[in-house]
C-alpha cells in the first residue's frame, strides 16, 4: 500500500514526487506520455518567457544560455532533475481508472458530511469553507494499462491538453486542420490560417510569418485589443513582434465573426461586421484552448466548477484536497494556471499530507 499515487509528470507531478521523497512517503508517479509532456508539446525552439525562479523546482538550478530558457532547455532541466533525484516515475503508462475501495474492504470508517464545500470568487481572490467529504475509505485502487496500484491518497497533477476545443464547423475533419502547432518548416511558402485569440495562436502566427508562410491570424477584435494578462491576452512579448510583422506586411489580421466552412484549398470566414470572405488556404491551425479530462475525478465524486480557464475541480486552496477525502489536485487543470503555481502547490500539500499520515499511523498504533 503506497502513501501516494501521483498522476502526471509535469512540473506539478515532478515537484510532488520530489517533496514526497524528501518527506519519506512511499509514492509512484504515472505519466501517460513523457516527463514534462506538456512542455514537450510546446512549439520547437519556443522561448519560455517566465522568469527562471517561476520555472525551477529548487532555486538556482535552471541555467539557460540566455536570459529566458527555450523549450528544449526547460525540458532538459526537468528530465535532469528527475534523474539526479532518482524520482520514481513511470512514463508511457496510462491510468485507466481510479476507484475508492469499499470501506468494508479497506477497514476505514466513512465520515458523515459536515458541511457543503463552497468556493466563491471576488475577482482573483478565492475563499472557501472546509470540504464536506463525499465518503470514501482513504484507500484507492489505481488501474493502468500496465498494472494496478493501491494507495491511501491520489494526487491528480494534470495539464489541460486532453481535449482541444473545436470550431464545430464543416471541414474541420480535413487532414490540413491541426489543433496544435509544433514547428514552422513544413509550412514555408504555404498559405496558413491561425484561428485563436490567446498566446498559443499568437506564437504560431508569429513563427509562421517570420519563417516565410503566407500567414493570416483570424481573431476576435476584443481578443486582439485585450491587454489584461488575467483575461488571457496575447502577452506583450508576442504582441509587439506580431505588430512589427503586420507593419512589414508579413502577417495579415482578420477580425473574425465566425468560421463558416473549411474546404480543400480554401476557408470561408465571416468578418466581425458580417461580410463573408473566402481565403486560399493550405493549412489551418485551430488554437482556441483545450480542456482537461475530469472524468475520473467526477466518477470519484469530486465536485467541479467553472474556473478561470474552463471547468476545474473544486478543492481547498489551503490543502489542495477535494471534497473526496484523500483525492488531491494540482497543476494547470486547476486554478493554478502557471508553472510556478503548479510547482509550489506540492510544497504545501505534501508536508500537510505527511503530518496527516503520521497522526493516522500514531492513532492506529495505540
Task: State the predicted function of each range.
Residues 5-7, 149-161, 195, 280-289:
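Short hydrophobic core segments
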Residues 11-87, 206-236, 305-311:
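Beta1-alpha1 glycine-rich phosphate/pyrophosphate-binding loop at the start
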Residues 70-101, 108, 136-162, 260-266:
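Feature captures the FAD/FMN-dependent oxidoreductase FAD-binding
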Residues 86-99, 139-142, 212-307:
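A Rossmann-like FAD-binding core segment of flavoenzymes
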Residues 135, 358-366:
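Short, low-complexity, charge-dense intrinsically disordered segments
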Residues 158-211, 308-318:
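Glycine-rich dinucleotide-binding loop and its adjacent helix/turn
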Residues 173-186, 290-338:
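FAD-site-proximal beta/loop scaffold in flavoenzymes
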Residues 330-357:
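A conserved FAD-binding loop/helix module that cradles the flavin
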Amino acid at each position: 500500500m503506497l502513501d501516494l499515487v501521483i498522476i502526471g509528470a509535469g512540473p506539478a507531478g515532478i515537484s510532488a514526487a520530489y517533496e514526497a521523497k524528501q518527506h519519506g512517503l512511499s509514492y509512484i508517479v504515472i505519466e501517460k506520455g513523457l516527463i514534462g509532456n506538456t512542455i514537450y508539446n510546446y512549439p520547437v525552439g519556443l522561448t519560455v518567457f517566465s522568469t527562471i525562479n517561476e520555472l525551477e523546482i529548487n532555486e538556482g538550478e535552471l541555467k539557460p544560455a540566455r536570459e529566458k530558457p527555450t523549450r528544449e532547455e526547460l525540458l532538459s532541466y526537468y528530465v535532469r532533475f528527475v534523474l539526479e533525484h532518482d524520482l520514481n516515475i513511470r512514463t508511457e503508462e496510462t491510468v485507466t481508472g481510479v476507484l475508492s475501495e469499499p470501506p468494508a474492504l479497506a477497514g476505514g470508517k466513512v465520515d458523515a458530511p459536515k458541511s457543503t464545500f463552497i468556493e466563491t470568487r471576488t475577482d482573483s481572490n478565492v475563499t472557501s469553507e472546509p470540504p464536506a467529504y463525499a465518503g470514501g475509505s482513504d484507500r484507492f485502487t489505481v488501474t493502468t494499462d500496465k498494472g494496478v496500484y493501491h494507495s491511501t491518497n491520489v494526487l491528480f497533477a494534470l495539464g489541460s491538453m486532453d481535449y482541444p476545443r473545436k470550431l464545430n464547423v464543416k471541414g474541420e475533419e480535413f487532414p490540413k486542420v491541426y489543433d496544435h502547432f509544433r514547428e514552422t518548416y513544413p509550412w514555408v511558402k504555404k498559405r496558413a490560417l491561425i484561428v485563436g485569440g490567446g498566446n498559443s495562436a499568437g506564437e504560431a502566427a508569429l513563427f509562421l510569418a517570420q519563417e516565410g508562410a503566407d500567414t493570416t491570424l483570424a481573431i476576435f477584435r476584443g481578443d486582439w485589443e485585450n491587454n489584461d494578462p488575467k483575461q488571457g491576452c496575447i502577452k506583450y512579448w508576442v504582441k509587439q513582434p506580431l505588430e512589427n510583422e503586420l507593419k512589414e506586411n508579413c502577417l495579415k489580421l482578420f477580425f473574425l465573426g465566425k468560421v463558416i466552412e473549411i474546404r480543400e484549398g480554401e476557408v470561408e470566414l465571416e468578418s466581425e461586421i458580417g461580410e463573408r470572405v473566402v481565403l486560399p488556404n493550405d493549412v489551418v491551425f485551430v488554437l482556441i484552448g483545450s480542456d482537461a479530462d475530469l472524468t475520473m475525478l467526477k466518477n470519484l465524486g469530486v465536485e467541479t466548477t467553472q474556473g478561470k480557464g474552463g471547468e476545474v475541480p473544486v478543492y481547498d486552496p489551503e490543502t489542495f484536497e477535494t471534497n473526496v477525502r484523500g483525492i488531491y489536485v494540482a497543476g494547470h487543470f486547476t486554478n493554478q494556471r502557471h508553472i510556478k503555481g503548479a510547482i509550489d502547490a506540492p510544497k504545501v500539500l505534501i508536508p500537510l499530507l505527511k503530518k496527516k499520515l503520521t497522526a493516522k499511523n500514531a492513532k492506529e498504533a495505540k
